[in-house]
């Protein structure tokens, strides 16, 4: 277990001015952060099932990348018994465990120095459709993670979750209008103003706007559940051939845009389609295990926003969610075709999906820089 160091210094400049930019996920990583799941009104059996799943995810990542886990003080002893010994437990208070969305975006410069962007956070919508209240502890998570690494911090004037952006490391940012232009995030900002801020804080210049995310995604359609970059000029898109499925028009609209756009380097995109699992639904037993609280209620029969695109690229591994025995092997084979140079590792991840996300959502990489 590690204690906090001196608080991260807040900078008054912007990453693009200072020559810092967000690297692609396939850039070398020095660490991956996760957060302990415990919310009884989001995780069944007060998080017991999710905790066991998070331990398996941490193990899959830890074989190639050091794993840090933020844990509230009251749960440190419990986390020590559940988590693999290689995981570094850090005392960090949080309202829930979505490291992708509450953690920092680490940016690097040509010298290999790292700094962090600390975005505003309002629990995916605040008082207008947010997923729980309060979220005050979550707002401090990024700063505490940056302090752990001794990185200076940029405070961005934008409500933004890490799961709502993907970059290729070469000037392109991909996102969804459903989330970033939602009235419950930054209602006072236009699309052009949001692009200007992302350009300043990620150091990107080209934006690919997909209309909508995955059907029933309670984050308002995060890009990381729908589509991601595989390498420069190539993307992986969540897909169904079933035209009667509510997901079909969403994926088709995304495909039409991706096939008719270029990235920041002027390349046309190669689009790899990865089939959706299921459809998957919450069971009565799963719904009953979730306590009542300020979180969004879990309902039996509710469709789950399962997606194999919600994987993590970490050093020489792809860690992806196993969600459906009918399609898991197809997804693994497809990922191996897309990423021949990577080891493809699946982790049973239904418990994460029941809480509203998946492997990419519960992880946040820290690039090596050097």
From Swiss-Prot:
Family statement: Belongs to the agmatine deiminase family.
Keyword vocabulary terms for this entry: Hydrolase
Listed name of the protein: Putative agmatine deiminase
GO molecular function, one term: protein-arginine deiminase activity
Record's compositionally biased regions (Polar residues): 1-19
Catalysed reaction equations from the record: agmatine + H2O = N-carbamoylputrescine + NH4(+)
PANTHER family listed in its UniProt record: AGMATINE DEIMINASE-RELATED
UniProt-annotated stretches for the region Disordered: 1-20
Superkingdom of origin organism: Bacteria
Active site: 361 (amidino-cysteine intermediate)
Enzyme Commission (EC) number: 3.5.3.12
GO biological process: putrescine biosynthetic process
């Amino acid at each position: 277990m590690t204690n906090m160091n001196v608080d991260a210094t807040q900078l008054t400049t912007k990453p693009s001015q200072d020559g810092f930019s967000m690297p692609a996920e396939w850039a070398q990583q020095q660490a991956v952060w996760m957060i302990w799941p415990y919310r009884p009104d989001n995780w069944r059996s007060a998080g017991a099932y999710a905790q066991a799943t998070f331990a398996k995810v941490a193990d899959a990542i830890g074989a190639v990348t050091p794993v840090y886990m933020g844990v509230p003080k009251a749960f440190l002893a419990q986390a020590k018994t559940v988590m693999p010994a290689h995981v570094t437990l850090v005392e960090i208070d949080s309202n829930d465990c979505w490291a992708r969305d509450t953690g920092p975006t680490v940016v690097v410069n040509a010298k290999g120095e790292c700094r962090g962007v600390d975005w505003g956070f309002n629990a995916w919508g605040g008082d207008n459709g947010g997923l729980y209240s309060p979220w005050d502890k979550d707002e401090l998570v990024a700063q505490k993670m940056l302090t752990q690494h001794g990185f200076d911090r940029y405070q961005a004037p934008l409500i933004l979750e890490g799961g709502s952006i993907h970059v290729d490391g070469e000037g392109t940012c991909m996102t969804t209008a459903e989330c970033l232009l939602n009235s419950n995030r930054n209602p006072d900002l236009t699309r052009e103003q949001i692009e200007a801020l992302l350009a300043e804080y990620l150091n990107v210049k080209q934006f690919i706007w997909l209309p909508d995310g995955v059907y029933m995604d309670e984050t308002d359609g995060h890009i990381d559940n729908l589509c991601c970059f595989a390498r420069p000029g190539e993307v992986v898109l969540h897909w169904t051939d079933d035209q009667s499925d509510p997901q079909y028009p969403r994926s088709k609209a995304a495909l039409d845009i991706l096939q008719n756009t270029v990235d920041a380097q002027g390349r046309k995109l190669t689009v790899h389609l990865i089939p959706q699992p299921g459809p998957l639904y919450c069971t009565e037993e799963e719904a009953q295990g979730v306590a009542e609280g300020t979180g969004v209620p879990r309902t039996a029969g509710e469709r789950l926003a399962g997606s194999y695109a919600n994987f993590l690229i970490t050093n020489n591994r792809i860690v992806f969610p196993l969600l459906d025995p009918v399609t898991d092997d197809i997804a693994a084979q497809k990922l191996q075709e897309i990423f021949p140079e990577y080891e493809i590792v699946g982790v049973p991840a239904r418990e994460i999906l029941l809480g509203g996300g998946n492997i990419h959502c519960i992880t946040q990489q820290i690039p090596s820089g050097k």
